[in-house]
């Protein structure tokens, strides 16, 4: 009698337990984790729309040519996917965001300029007309030096865009 009661009771208990688990379980894709909520992505988009306006003004003055920078899309991407999509020669800069918050450790970002844009900017900075010609080579030391100054100013412009949300001192 006890065996039949305990056998039936354990089946009923297991059935209740699986039903409770089924209600609380959410599917999670470990291969492609989503770390940001839609609200956070909208905030990031707002920040970078402000940033686009700021650097549009900076680049227009620097290059003596009307420049319009726009946010096309915000998406999450793993670093190795980003890295694998880069061409062989690319203009990259790492920026320490200098977040003023004791709860946040050092936070760095990567800024990348597409090669056609980089070569057009270099041409304008050197007095040319900024026409793009397809170039597939590494950057010279002079080109890197010119773009280092530009990238520093672009990094410093991040402060104005991020300040309404968090105090940063990008370097």
Predicted regions and their residues:
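N-terminal auxiliary interaction/assembly segments of multi-subunit proteins
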Residues: 1-171
């Amino acid at each position: 009698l006890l065996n039949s009661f305990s056998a039936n009771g354990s089946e009923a208990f297991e059935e209740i337990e699986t039903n409770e688990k089924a209600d609380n379980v959410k599917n999670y894709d470990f291969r492609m984790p989503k770390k940001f909520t839609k609200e956070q992505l909208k905030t990031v988009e707002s920040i970078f729309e402000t940033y686009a306006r700021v650097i549009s003004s900076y680049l227009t003055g620097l290059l003596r040519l009307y420049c319009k920078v726009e946010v096309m899309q915000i998406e999450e991407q793993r670093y190795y996917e980003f890295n694998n999509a880069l061409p062989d020669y690319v203009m990259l800069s790492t920026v320490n965001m200098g977040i003023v918050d004791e709860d946040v450790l050092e936070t760095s970002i990567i800024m990348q300029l597409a090669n056609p844009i980089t070569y057009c900017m270099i041409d304008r900075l050197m007095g040319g007309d900024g026409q793009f010609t397809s170039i597939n080579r590494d950057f010279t030391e002079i080109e890197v030096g010119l773009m280092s100054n530009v990238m520093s100013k672009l990094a410093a412009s991040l402060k104005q865009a991020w300040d309404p949300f968090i105090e940063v001192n990008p370097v």
